[in-house]
């Protein structure tokens, strides 16, 4: 009788989901017609305010402040055309020679919108000897605005590098002794949060949670705008909870604790990740698909990394590459289960998009997933052979396995009429924008996770590769890699401003993916270890409503 040899698997023990079935059931309530009518009335009020200010140069500074508040309150999707018109008009009228109020708000808003305005305008903040003027130091809010604007810098913009270093130092002093600077507690807290994470690196939905209470405390706040922001937050929260319930049922039906016991059970955290990519109501269909995609990618990652043995992984990679149900019989039982989920999920979305004549969108999403799986396989081969790649070899592969080359085109699927085939083709070439976001993802992940991964059989990280090649300390690599992350942000900013053949709405998906990493991997791996910060963020987005 043949003795069946036991397969030794490199399993990691992940903690179960802390949420249980909390989001499984959503008690949907019919929207109050009176509230819906009020929202429309408030929108009209704000719309009129924007358009009135547009034609009066004396109101242009206030117009920019209004646009900034609309964006930070999370309701810019309500005024997309008006904001585009307003910022386009400001650029047409002033070019690089802004004459109104805050230079920093003007600069930040126009660069965010894709206008490559010059940073030379900030020279007026400097003395002849290159130091910053005392008048700036005395203006706390002005320093904060300049600090935020400086994060829109590209490589070579020395004045913005200087401005960031200067304002950061000054703002840190203020937070240590706010009373000395006549800084109230609300503004001091606002500054601390900015130093922790600037606007440009924040997840837009979390900025809403943070900014609404601050805005409400300002004497100059616009009551209609505030009320609209709160009502829209709650309305959107209901939509998000409904989506999360739908996704929770989808995942629970697979009985993951039984059939995928080795996989991180992090559906809620992954939906939060996708909410960072787009939270707006018009992207509901895309959000649901992308959450399924990132969940599948997590299953693949854990299979290649933590459970599958080499021979199985070779067959599995070939099956994904061929993408045919005829491949399923060659797979081990647990892989058959995964493969069926994979084919069914993409097939379902392909049918939906085919009904709109856009099945090609899912084709490109599939091609991106195939590329991800091929590179997972290369890492598995290195681990199996005990091979230590050079840093260059490593990054050729690990920038792909960071996942953003796959997630970017996948995030475009179902976004609407403005998405043509060209952006999908562009995304699959691994262009500079997506590569830079992948640098942020890979490096921040490796800095946080390389020590834990080093405790088991695992491909070496970029941190170890660099240490070995250059014979330097771990701390040296950390500092160097953090500079690389900042340079990657500068490169993303440049692409946002110069990659003109891709719509801004699509480029922002990649920017938002990088923002997610800044939120989830800054201090810990919040997918493996669901810490207090991400728990609080999830509660803020899905459980705690705004009081009206």
Swiss-Prot record:
EC number in record:
4.2.3.57, 4.2.3.127, 4.2.3.-
Give the enzyme's main class according to its UniProt record, as a single word.
lyase
Residues engaged in binding Mg(2+) 2: 301, 305
**Motif (DDXXD motif) spans which residues?**
301-305
Q: In which tissues is it expressed?
A: Expressed in leaves and stems.
Q: Which UniProt keywords apply?
A: Cytoplasm, Lyase, Magnesium, Metal-binding
Positions of Mg(2+) 1 binding? 301, 305
The principal localisation class reads: cytoplasm
Named in its record, the pathway it takes part in is: Secondary metabolite biosynthesis; terpenoid biosynthesis
- A single Pfam family it belongs to is Terpene_synth_C
The protein's annotated catalytic reaction(s) are: (2E,6E)-farnesyl diphosphate = germacrene D + diphosphate; (2E,6E)-farnesyl diphosphate = (-)-(E)-beta-caryophyllene + diphosphate; (2E,6E)-farnesyl diphosphate = beta-copaene + diphosphate
Q: Which GO terms describe its molecular function?
A: magnesium ion binding; terpene synthase activity
Residue positions binding (2E,6E)-farnesyl diphosphate = 264, 301, 305, 442, 445
Q: Does the keyword Cell inner membrane apply?
A: no
Q: Does the keyword Lyase apply?
A: yes
Kindly list the biological process annotations in GO that this record carries: diterpenoid biosynthetic process; terpene biosynthetic process
Family to which this protein belongs: Belongs to the terpene synthase family. Tpsa subfamily.
Query: What is stated about domains?
Result: The Asp-Asp-Xaa-Xaa-Asp/Glu (DDXXD/E) motif is important for the catalytic activity, presumably through binding to Mg(2+).
This protein's assembly is summarised as: Monomer.
Protein name per Swiss-Prot or TrEMBL:
Sesquiterpene synthase TPS1
